[in-house]
Structure formats: C-alpha cells, structure tokens
Amino acid sequence: MIKRFSLLSFVFILACSIVGCQQIDASQEQKQFDQFIQQEFVKTMESDYVATHIYMQNPESFGIDLSKTEVSLGARPNSDGEIVTAQDSDNAYNTFQQFHRNALTEEQKDIYDIYEYQASLSQKLNNEKFDYYGSYFESMSGIQFQLSTLFADWQVRNEKDVQDLITLLNDTKPYVESVLEYTKKQEENGLLMLDLESIIEYCDSILQPGENSAILASMNTSVEQLSLDTEKTEKYKSQLKEAFSSSFLSAFESIRSTMETFQKTGRNNTEGLAKFKYGKEYYELLLQQSIGSNKSVEDIREMMEEAFSTHLYNCAKIVISNPESVEPLISNTLPKTGYLSYTDILDDMKNVISEEFPPVSNLNYHIENMNEELASKSGVTAYFNIPTLDGDSVKQLRVNPISNDVSSISTFSTVAHEGFPGHMYQYAYMYENVESNYIKALSNISAYTEGYAVYAQYEALSYLDGVDQTLLEAYKENELATYCMIILADIGIHYDGWSVEEFKEFMESKGFSLDDASIQTQYAQLQANPAAFEPYYVGYHEIISMKEDAQQTLGSRFHEKEFHTALLESGTAPFQVVQRHIDAYVEKNK
C-alpha cells in the first residue's frame, strides 16, 4: 500500500512537472482558436450553397471559395440517414477539444461554449443506435414546408442567381427522392412516425394550382425585377416553368404517392417516441437540443409543472380581483388595438422600445406580403427572414395578406414577436454588436431566439396604451399556462408513452375539456413534432427566471435597459452563456 502510494505520488509529481514545462501561450491559443472557428465557418458554408446564398451577398469577402460550393439543395442522407458522417464530425470535435478554454478571451469562451454545446449534442444524436429516428416530414416544419417557402422567398440579386435558382429547382426531385428512400427505410425498420394525412393534404395544396402556382409566379417576378433584356427574361422564365413542373411538382407528387402507400400498407407509429427501443433516450437529446441547456426531461417537467401552477394562480387572482376587466377574455370578445396596418405597429414599437431596450443604429425594415398560396394554408400571421451578414441590412418581414385581423391583440403580439422588439430587433442588435460570424450564422440555439421573441412579445403588451393592462396581464398568464400544459403533454407523449386517451385524461385533469376531434388534432400535432414547442416556452421561462433573479438581487438598482443589454450581448447562445452575461451585469450593479 505504501509502495503504491509512493509510485502514484511520483507519477503525479512528474505529470505536474511536465505540465509546468508546457505553459500555454495564451495569445497563440487565441489565434489558433480563431483560425479553427473561421475554418469551421468556411467549411460549413462551402458545403451548403443554400446557407451561403441566404447569409452572404458577397461570399468571397468572407473567405468562401465558391468553386468548392455545389449549387444544390444540400447533402443527401447516407445509408444510415446521416447528413454529415460521424467521422467528419468527430474529427472537427476532436480538434476543438485540444483547445484550452481558460486561455481564451471572454468572447472566445462564449464561442467555445456554443460550439461545445452544439457539437456534443450532435455527436450523441449521431450514435448509430438512433439511425432512422429523425424525420424529414414533420407536420409543422418538414421539408414539404421548407421547400415551398424557400423557393417562394428566394432572393434573386443578379443573373447568376437566376441560373442557380433553375439549378436548385431541378435538384428538387433528386433531393426529395433521396429523402423518400431514407423514409422508406424508416418504415422498413419500424421507425416511421408521421402525420400522413396532414402531409398528403399539404401536397394537394401545392399540386392543385399546378403551373399557375403563386410560388412560380413569385420566382418569375424576381426575374422580371432584374430588368434583363426581354429575350433573356423570357428564356429564364421558360426554364423556371419547365424545372418547376418536371422537378418541383413531380417531387411533391412523389411525396404524396409515398405517403398514400404508407397509409395503405405501411407500419406507422401513431404514438410517441417512447414506443421505440431507444425512443426515450433520443427524446431527451432532442429536448436538450431544443431548450438551450443540458437539463433533463425531469428538470423540464418540474419547471413546467411549477410554471403552470404559477400562471394559473396569477390568472385566477386577476379574474377574482378584476372580473369586469377580464370579462372580454372569458367571453372571447377581446378589444381591438386600434392599429390599421403592420407598418403602424412596427413604427410605434421602434419608437417606444428605446426606453427599455439598448439602441440599435439601423432598424430599417421592409414588409412584403407572404406568398398567397402559402398564406392561405399556413394560418401564419407573419414571419421574419434572416438578413444577410453583409448587404444593406434592411430587415425583411413577411406578413399574411388574407387571414388575419391587423387590429387584433393576437396580430399585435405576433408582429412584436417577429418584428420589434422580437426577432427583427434581436438580429439587428446582434449584427451590430457581435463580431463573430460563427455566432451570427451557425449558432443554432432556437431556445434563445424563440424564447427571447416570446419574452419580447409579452413585454410589448405593456406598450398597448389603448387596452386595459389588467386584461392584457390575464391574457398573457392564460396563454402561458396553456403552453406549459402543451409542453407537459409533449413529454407525456414522447417520454411516458401516452395514448390519445391518456392525453385526453391529462387535459381534463388540468381543466381543459375538448371534444374528441380537437383532442385527436392536438395529439397528432404533438406526436408528429417532438419537442417543437419547447424552444418557445422553456426558452421564455429561462429568460424570465434570470430576470426575476436579477430583480430580486438588485432591487431598485435593477434597470430594464441594462438587463436587456446583458440578455442580448452574447448573441444566440445556450443559456449557460447568457447566464454568465446576466451574472456579470448583476455583479457590476450590486
């Protein structure tokens, strides 16, 4: 025992002496880390034409070699359904892990933690036991939606973009066929989990107009706005029409046909991920990917249970204390905001948020009606298009021209979420104040971006001077209680394995009595889109928790604008990074 202790002591001393001889040159470490992150940014962009086009007007100025970029819709699933091979991912992650975090600058530590969070989760999800667990055809955000929106909103800046757009359209059929092959293998392995009827209905809505599609019309308009000579314009429009018919529409016909076959003879799991062998483990990783932290399913369940009780209590308290004020909420006769246009809402918000949010020099924006064909079937009020990292910095908002009442509280809330002080403002602040292109383009922490936008939409309610604030507070608490319940149901379906009947019993236990058709619709939406709502409402509760802690610690020294600066200054990041910035703000102002 004594000899063993002596040997271990010697090894420990030797190790310490070796480390002592290998002191890290912090400036060199920082330089190499910047080079690694830049290489990752360039490598990602060069391998993804669509991302390059969306984020950059002049890719060469970012170090992108366009000769290495294939004009296509992206990499296809391999035999195991992976887009990026585990080896490629592991090689980059292994290189990353050689860096010494303590030698980095504070901004680099943020980037380090973002990369670590994303890469470690990706590595776990790429485990071969999860082969064919991921779905390409989720009913809320599957490729059937992504493709139609992508082409309807595609930015054409020059003649080369038109040529590339035609190439992309022609790539739709082969891309979709590769994804359908993957989906067929899912079914063969007993891992299919789709809302088949909703996919078929969406395909029908795309196919029904045929070549009279508003999507094709939108692309034609983009070509016409370049003011090329008439011969070229007509040639490109003819090529677009041919590609749209033979590739885009044909791809949707293939999707529809495959889903119909699954309906007739396929094995399709109509319950949650818990029904699969590794489903609970897979769901927990999906959950962590969607919440911006490594909290467990049980942590989130407890968070949502507590939040649900709090929101329900707050709502009941308001109703009891102010029955007349909240009667419009109970009777579903909410008052109008008085706004007559989306522009009026955004211009007002741009002016009033300056008291509580940090200044941004460029809040220029442009509103366009969303594609009518997509608007008519989506029910979406508005959405924000991510701006390029370079270019004129004008923010783009798409709004629904046909299905929403601009003067409703709901529309105001959505425009605040997508516009000011939500996504549009957050991106404007980030582009102006965060230097790292990696954070701006490749940090995909939806719990931060969506959680912040939900927080922003509820903050904006306080600016509605013409509506009773007591009513608006009850409106907010009622909505948040409902969404907490939906996240609890998502956990119930995918982690606990609830059936439709168990879901119905849960809803009734929370005081929500729905007819069977509504129960089935809500269950199907949650079942086909695991962890889809968590970014919004877990993200919101993470932010509001940080705010309440800061308010409690600082008391009268708490200031909204300084808190919002701390909340925004990291850019898109997991909450451990955001918390560090909030902690620094609190420590500075104690």
What role is predicted for each listed range?
Residues 17-20:
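C-terminal motif of bacterial Sec signal peptides marking the signal peptidase cleavage site
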Residues 10-15:
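Hydrophobic helical h-region of N-terminal Sec-dependent signal peptides
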Residues 8-9, 422:
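Intrinsically disordered, low-complexity segments enriched in polar/charged small residues
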Residues 23-590:
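N-terminal maturation segment of proteins
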Residues 1-7:
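Positively charged n-region of N-terminal signal peptides that target proteins for export
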